[in-house]
UniProtKB/Swiss-Prot annotation:
<keyword id="KW-0694">RNA-binding</keyword>
<keyword id="KW-0808">Transferase</keyword>
<feature type="binding site">
    <location>
        <position position="252"/>
    </location>
    <ligand>
        <name>ATP</name>
    </ligand>
</feature>
<dbReference type="GO" id="GO:0004810">
    <property type="term" value="F:CCA tRNA nucleotidyltransferase activity"/>
</dbReference>
<keyword id="KW-0963">Cytoplasm</keyword>
<feature type="binding site">
    <location>
        <position position="274"/>
    </location>
    <ligand>
        <name>ATP</name>
    </ligand>
</feature>
<comment type="similarity">
    <text>Belongs to the ThiI family.</text>
</comment>
<protein>
    <recommendedName>
        <fullName>Probable tRNA sulfurtransferase</fullName>
        <ecNumber>2.8.1.4</ecNumber>
    </recommendedName>
</protein>
<feature type="binding site">
    <location>
        <begin position="170"/>
        <end position="171"/>
    </location>
    <ligand>
        <name>ATP</name>
    </ligand>
</feature>
<keyword id="KW-0820">tRNA-binding</keyword>
<dbReference type="InterPro" id="IPR020536">
    <property type="entry name" value="ThiI_AANH"/>
</dbReference>
<keyword id="KW-0547">Nucleotide-binding</keyword>
<dbReference type="InterPro" id="IPR054173">
    <property type="entry name" value="ThiI_fer"/>
</dbReference>
<dbReference type="Pfam" id="PF22025">
    <property type="entry name" value="ThiI_fer"/>
</dbReference>
<dbReference type="GO" id="GO:0002937">
    <property type="term" value="P:tRNA 4-thiouridine biosynthesis"/>
</dbReference>
<dbReference type="InterPro" id="IPR004114">
    <property type="entry name" value="THUMP_dom"/>
</dbReference>
<dbReference type="InterPro" id="IPR049962">
    <property type="entry name" value="THUMP_ThiI"/>
</dbReference>
Length: 376
């Protein structure tokens, strides 16, 4: 019955001079994620109808809504025939919503509403209710075809992945960082991932968990990378510092310096993470400022103001929850001190780092010799 799926751009039509670029990126993403061709018009796109395409459109950012449509010719009998195919036996009331985009068509929208409404009244059990109908028959008169449909499915909104460039995202096995990655994609970032492990304390189970999380997230983008960094050389070195309360601050500053160099190698400008204000000791205002001061890159924190319940609920929506809830050994948790500093200063942190003579050398070794890359 259905021949095509009509896709509406939503936010993209508001982007002025960048509009064409946004829509081309959306088309490219649809082609990659759904492995299908598309037809593009000013305010919408069409792809071939299939149940698989209908299901997978929920993974494409930049779509306001979409509808499976019957495509028919520009004559009244064919339009009536299409409406007949859509009549729902469980509905009691209906409304006709005609839209004449092609002004050369002989009937205007009001005339179409009246004629087609009369047809449905005469040829079905349905009664008219324009305020709260059970079923709405939408008829769009376009230049080359007429499209008839009775449902509109919400897309996930946002803007197309890739339009905002790339970001290197620090991911762990918890709830927060996968959700943060999703939100970055929603604002047009293509995301590469970096995770830190400390074998033998963290084993292959932990790495597999991270890989599985990135695979779920890869439904929203194609051809990204996961970098797995063996951080054990540095974690062992920092473990024996006399300033025990600063261990996590020192580790995370080291994380960011390594991430910054990796981003530079891959021509990525920004670093991101799943940090949430005041959730743990390293996420106080002072801690984040000191950790962030270790690099010049902009650090994006999409979850900064989210409640934990909001994060968990979103993880269920994007289907990372059931992976994140599995037990694993995270680097920061394994080496967290009993009494971590919550209000560090940059001056004191720099004094401590100045006493760690081998830290810079170890960071270079880890970056160049202890990094594995996986295509997702």
């Amino acid at each position: 019955m259905y021949k095509k799926i009509l896709i509406r751009y939503g936010e993209l039509v508001l982007k002025g001079k960048n509009r064409t670029t946004f829509i081309k990126q959306l088309g490219s993403n649809i082609k990659e994620i759904l492995n299908t061709e598309y037809e593009m018009e000013f305010d919408r796109m069409y792809i071939p109808y299939s149940e698989e395409n209908l299901k997978n459109l929920k993974y494409v950012f930049g779509i306001s809504s979409f509808s499976p449509v019957i495509e028919t010719n520009k004559n009244l009998e064919d339009i009536q025939s299409a409406i007949t195919k859509l009549i729902n036996k469980n509905a009691s009331t209906f409304k006709i919503a005609a839209r004449r985009n092609d002004k050369s068509f002989e009937l205007n929208s009001d005339q179409l509403n009246n004629l087609l409404g009369g047809f449905v009244l005469k040829n079905s059990h349905l009664k008219v209710n324009v305020k709260n109908p059970d079923q709405i028959f939408n008829i769009e008169i376009r230049k080359n075809s007429v499209y008839v449909f009775d449902k509109s499915i919400n897309g996930i909104g946002g803007i197309p992945v890739g339009i905002s460039g790339k970001v290197l995202h620090l991911i762990s096995g918890g709830f927060d960082s996968p959700v943060a990655a999703y939100l970055l994609m929603k604002r047009g970032f293509k995301v590469d991932f970096l995770t830190f492990v400390t074998p033998p304390q963290t084993d292959e189970t932990t790495i597999d968990k991270i890989k599985n999380l990135t695979k779920v997230l890869s439904r929203y983008q194609k051809e990204s990378n996961l970098y797995v960094c063996d951080f054990s050389l540095i974690s062992s070195y920092i473990e024996f510092t006399e300033f025990k309360s600063f261990k996590i601050i020192l580790m995370r500053r080291s994380f960011y310096r390594i991430a910054s160099e990796l981003a530079k190698q891959n021509e990525i400008l920004m670093i991101s993470n799943g940090e949430n204000l005041a959730q743990v000791a390293s996420q106080t205002n002072e801690s984040m400022a000191v950790i962030g001061s270790s690099i010049k890159n902009e650090i994006l924190r999409p979850l900064l103001t989210y409640d934990k319940n909001e994060i968990i609920n979103l993880s269920k929506v994007i289907e990372t929850h059931d992976i994140s809830i599995l037990k694993s050994k995270e680097a920061c948790e394994l080496f967290a001190p009993k009494n971590p500093v919550t209000k560090p200063t940059e001056a004191k942190t720099l004094r401590i780092e100045s006493k760690l003579d081998e830290l810079k050398t170890y960071e270079e070794i880890v970056l160049n010799q202890k990094m594995k890359k996986f295509a997702i």
